[in-house]
Amino acid sequence: MCIRDRFIFFQIILGAFLAGLDGGLIYNTWPDMNGKFLPDDVSIASFFSSESFNTPSIIQFIHRKMAYILFILILYLNIVYIYKKLPIINILLFDLAVLFQIFLGVITLLSGAKIFYASLHQIGSIIVVSSFLYICYKNINTNLQPSN
């Protein structure tokens, strides 16, 4: 498992924590968090507290920033695909799934976590993982696979 894989699964776990803590009901602005980079009720020290995974604003902050990091990693993956002259169709499904997931995440947030959008966003995570597994399968014989 390479770092990109870990980021995807960590992002899904953060989303599960966020849903469980009803974190989508707070800070319903985007791209900032009520006009600020860091939420009002969070300090840098609180990130290192034992309660950090019970604080919805911290989870939402990390979930948002992880999404940006994942987007950059996926852009890099696309560049590698083009550079190695691999069939772009293999990664197109993954790209579309990720873009749709980002769109759903923003819509879910701006809607105040309406159940329809929140459910679609959770289903979208399954589609992202499935499409990622598909490109891993399609590239099993290339050097894009991480070494153990």
Where are each of the predicted segments found?
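Membrane-embedded alpha-helical segments of multi-pass membrane proteins
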Residues: 65-70, 120-128
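Interfacial helix-loop-helix junctions of multi-pass membrane proteins
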Residues: 18-28, 102-126
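Membrane-interface helix-loop-helix junctions at transmembrane boundaries of multi-pass membrane enzymes
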Residues: 78-94
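Short, small-residue-biased leader/transition segments that mark boundaries at the very start
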Residues: 1-3
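Aromatic-anchored segments of alpha-helical transmembrane domains
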Residues: 8-13, 97-106
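Juxtamembrane loop-transmembrane helix junctions in multi-pass integral membrane proteins
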Residues: 51-61, 85-89, 109-119
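A juxtamembrane structural motif centered on a specific transmembrane helix
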Residues: 130-148
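Membrane-interfacial catalytic/cofactor-binding modules of polytopic membrane enzymes
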Residues: 12-70, 75, 79
